[in-house]
Regions:
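Short cationic amphipathic helices and targeting signals
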Residues: 349-358, 417-422, 663, 686-709, ...
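A cross-kingdom feature marking solvent-exposed beta-strand/loop segments within repeated
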Residues: 325, 378-412, 439-449, 707-730
């Protein structure tokens, strides 16, 4: 049954029942999240009004979903349609009062019983025939108001604020790159002359800007989309000379002994490459098996992500070596050492990276390597795979196995007993030069100092070294400008995809890119690239004319750049000035990891990291916040299971803050009244309130003195209280401690004391075995809430594509995958499916979701981190001229840890040794 709501010219709403027969629902698989949706529940329409305007009118409908439609509300599956397709860019928002409550008081931001507003734009002056879809649907006629310009302006402001805020919320909660939200807000803002949302314009501090420049984070592409749609694209051709390089202060290392041992593998590593050394074959097998336990991605040890690459281990797959079980059994008989080197880490779009092998028998390894590569090329002949030989200026040879689109790009070079498989010709050439002693990492004073600090004799399981020249190379004009150009190419691919979708959804007739530009869907001069590159679709993937297939671009190191545009010249000069004024030198970094086998399936992993000789001025952002090393510690309470301590320098939050010892803990005791139900959202204040712990300072109040309500005179027992936050403060002797539970503070009094510490440190963290603790259920629930939220965010994206672009639900997932170049996956390890509602509409859900109305933690759910994590100790100290980090991690391996892995961290060295 549907209900028709009629709106009279005077704004009165009345209902009329219709007899439209519902479409029977397809049988559900018994998933609790969808059980309630087998019954059609029409949304209750509370009010509606629409105001005429140009180029768009603006309307609003206030409605309420019925109980049972919680999943519809939470996933953004409420849909609004108009009989003549006149509605555009709808957005759902809380009423202003509800929004205030949601931010500060309520726990559930999307209760189906709450009153919601759906704002929308429309074209034309005739009354609107609108249908609002929940699990059921309600249809209403909305007359147009022409004579209230002030109300129109207020509606326009509310619609834009709601639209941009909704985009901000999706960006905050989602795991995926927010390209769709960025495009829509930029396009609409430009159409209507509205300000860009705060999330996109949010300024970045120096550290964030440095990180983005070095590691090509997704934020650069998001900024490129916004810039293209609001400012336009660079229209000039590259005719100007390259801007000068950044002038770095040289790193000086003195007084080194002459007898420092350097491993043979490092002799052939270029001094501008990062270097990851396993040392032995069994060490890479250990990491390989650890990776296999978590589906080929170590990040899944902490939390399942909401997306995954279309091709796992992209660069290793690109190297075109197949694997067998020989890896584990016989690899060590021919391989003496294993390493990974690279000039960058741009895995998403073509990294200059390679795998090094130090052979025990070079002739046997080389023979088998070449044989397997020939077989691979023959097997992939239909992809035009070929093997060619390249002769260098030094008359050395490099073998290249490749396909025209770069899907496979594997250079093979041999220098003595060192072998290299790499995606980059430049890395291969530098490998051969380094083996001859030209620019070898082993010959640099900084690496020798690193080996003096962390000698080869330590027999580390992993040794990672990032030299100064590695960072400097990433910040050369050649690297940065090419990185900017390829980001623009990828941005254009995504923009073109979204523009076609939106134009089709708005029934705009287009046949070419020029049509889309003229319609405002693409920026003027779209597709103009300084180097003259173009792009096209081939099958189901994008390809750049100069760089190859998206995701497998020719590495930056292999691109030749000689001329730049004026905009590029200015852009790099600004960044060079930033470093000249803020960071005059870049320091090497090194990390060492060693594992120790414990009883049964337990392992202890000890790790050390150092940032070597440094100039303190470039770390002022950190140094100014770190106080002197702590030679004492706060006595541990028996219930503490997670503890942290930090020396905090005055000035962190204000000039009045004094240097103090900050400490806190999560305790192994739960309030029996705590709400541990699964929730499909995660609010920071709610999380703090439910955390069974405390935060304190000594010998002065320090950061605990941040609220005026808590800074008053304490009562006779030392307490003050904030009614707004429901937060207690204990002032006891020289301690000031905050907690949401007064009983916890009272029990803590007897343990508050300062005792000597075994070692000085500025930061200490200690975490016990959460999986076998009393708060396991709390930690598990916290992880579930975050994962559920990320899983829902993916479906919100699909619903956004459906609503804003008019893409049918059955196509939205493939469209999202194509645009983002990732596969959207459920972060609860479920499967995304479609459910046909009683009225015939399809909606997306995950079969791992519990009921939204009355959620219960799924039986057997255990957060990924709780399956293996058994403890952590971490210390950080800055003393004299270096930062040092020391940690101990206790791990429980799975029962399959000793089995042969089917996923190969370094695809496939085993088959190299088969006859």
């Amino acid at each position: 049954m549907a209900i028709i709501f009629m709106v009279s010219p005077w704004g009165l709403v009345y209902a009329q029942q219709t007899t439209k027969a519902p479409t029977p629902a397809i049988g559900d698989n018994g998933n609790l999240a969808t059980d309630d949706l087998l019954i059609a529940r029409p949304p209750a329409i509370l009010s509606a009004e629409a105001h005429a305007g140009r180029p768009y009118g603006i309307g609003r409908i206030n409605y309420r979903l019925q109980p049972g439609d919680e999943m519809i509300a939470r996933t953004g599956a409420v849909l609004i349609t108009e009989a003549n397709q006149r509605i555009s860019f709808p957005v759902i928002a809380d009423t202003p009062f509800r929004e205030f409550l949601g931010n500060f008081l309520r726990s559930n931001p999307s209760n189906s019983a709450d009153t919601k507003s759906i704002w929308f734009l429309f074209k034309g002056d005739q009354p609107l025939n609108v249908t609002l879809h929940g699990s059921g649907q309600s249809t209403l006629d909305v007359p147009i108001v022409f004579d209230k310009p002030n109300r129109y302006e207020r509606f326009a402001k509310n619609w834009w604020n709601s639209f941009s805020s909704a985009s901000d919320d999706m960006i905050e909660s989602g795991d995926y790159p927010p390209m769709v939200e960025t495009y829509l807000t930029a396009l609409i803002g430009k159409r209507l002359g509205l300000a860009t949302p705060k999330q996109i314009l949010r300024s970045k501090d120096a550290l964030a800007r440095t990180f983005e420049l070095l590691f090509d984070v997704e934020a650069l592409r998001i900024e490129a989309i916004n810039k293209a749609m609001t400012v336009g694209v660079d229209q000039d051709l590259a005719t100007l000379p390259m801007p000068p390089k950044i002038q770095w202060t040289p790193l000086v290392v003195e007084n080194l002994p002459e007898d420092i041992v350097i491993e043979p593998l490092a002799q052939a590593v270029p001094h501008e490459c990062f270097y990851l050394r396993f040392g032995t074959w069994k060490n890479q097998i250990w990491l390989q098996q650890l990776t296999e336990e978590f589906g080929g991605n170590l990040s899944r040890m902490i939390q399942l992500r909401g997306y995954q690459p279309k091709i796992q281990s992209k660069f290793l797959d690109q190297l075109a070596i197949q694997s067998s079980e020989f890896d584990r059994l016989f690899g060590g008989s021919l391989i003496d050492d294993v390493g990974v080197i690279g000039m960058d880490s741009y895995f998403d779009n073509g990294a200059a990276i390679g795998v090094m092998l130090h052979a025990k028998n070079t002739k046997a390894l080389s023979s088998n390597m070449r044989s397997k590569r020939k077989k691979f090329a023959a097997k992939h002949a239909d992809e035009n795979a070929t093997i060619t030989t390249i002769t260098t200026d030094a008359d050395e040879t490099i073998e290249l196995l490749s396909t025209p689109d770069n899907r496979y790009r594997s250079f093979y070079a041999v220098a003595g007993d060192n072998h290299l498989l790499t995606t980059s010709r430049r890395v291969a050439e530098r490998f051969l030069e380094s083996a001859r002693g030209i620019g070898s990492l082993a010959n640099t004073r900084e690496f020798q100092f690193a080996r003096y600090q962390m000698p080869v004799e330590r027999d580390d399981t992993l040794f990672i070294y990032l030299p100064t020249r590695f960072f400097q190379q990433l910040l050369t004009p050649e690297y940065q400008i090419e990185l900017r150009r390829r980001n623009q190419v990828v941005t254009d691919m995504v923009l073109y995809e979204m523009a076609k979708l939106l134009a089709a959804g708005e029934s705009y007739d287009f046949k070419s890119i020029d049509d889309l530009i003229n319609g405002g869907y693409l920026p003027i001069r779209f597709g103009s690239h300084p180097e003259g590159s173009t792009f096209e679709t081939i099958g189901d993937y994008w390809q750049c004319s100069l760089r190859g297939r998206r995701g497998f671009f020719t590495p930056v190191a292999d691109m030749k750049i000689e001329r730049v545009t004026l905009d590029e010249q200015r852009w790099f000069t600004q960044r060079a000035d930033f470093f000249s004024n803020n960071i005059k030198s870049l320091d090497p970094m090194m990390i060492a990891v060693k594992r120790y086998k414990q009883e049964d399936k337990f392992e202890r992993i000890v790790f050390d990291a150092q940032v070597l000789p440094l100039g303190e001025d470039k770390y002022k952002w950190l140094v100014q916040r770190m106080g002197p090393p702590l030679k004492q510690e706060v006595r541990r309470a028996p219930e503490d299971i997670v503890r942290f301590e930090a020396s905090v320098q005055g000035g962190l939050l204000g000039a009045t803050a004094q240097t103090h010892h900050l400490f806190g803990a999560v305790q192994d005791y739960l309030d029996p009244d705590i709400d541990l139900k699964p929730k499909s959202f995660l609010r920071l204040l709610d999380t703090f309130r439910q955390t069974p712990g405390y935060v304190g300072a000594w010998p002065n109040a320090g950061l605990t003195n941040w609220m005026p309500q808590l800074g008053g005179q304490p009562d006779a027992f030392g307490y003050t209280y904030s009614r707004l936050l429901k937060l207690w403060r204990l002032q006891w002797e020289d301690f000031s401690v905050l907690s949401f539970d007064q009983r916890r503070l009272e029990a803590l009094k007897q343990h508050l004391a300062i005792i000597p510490s075994p070692r000085p440190a500025q930061v200490r963290i200690k975490v016990g075995d959460l999986a076998n603790s009393k708060i396991q259920v709390w930690a598990n629930m916290l992880n579930f809430r975050r994962s559920w939220q990320a899983s829902i965010a993916n479906i919100q994206l699909l619903n956004l594509i459906n609503q804003q672009f008019g893409t049918p639900p059955e196509q939205t997932r493939s469209v999202a995958s194509r645009m983002l170049d990732v596969e959207l996956v459920c972060s609860l390890d479920g499967q995304y499916k479609r459910l046909r509602l009683p009225m015939g509409r399809n909606v997306w859900y995950s079969d791992a979701w519990p009921s939204f109305g009355n959620p219960v933690l799924p039986k057997g759910y255990l957060a990924p981190v709780l399956t293996w994590f058994r403890g952590l100790e971490l210390e950080v100290i800055k003393e004299d001229t270096q930062f040092s980090l020391h940690g101990i991690l206790d791990v429980q391996r799975s029962e399959q840890a000793d089995a042969l892995p089917s996923f190969d961290l370094f695809k496939g060295f085993g088959e190299l040794f088969e006859k």
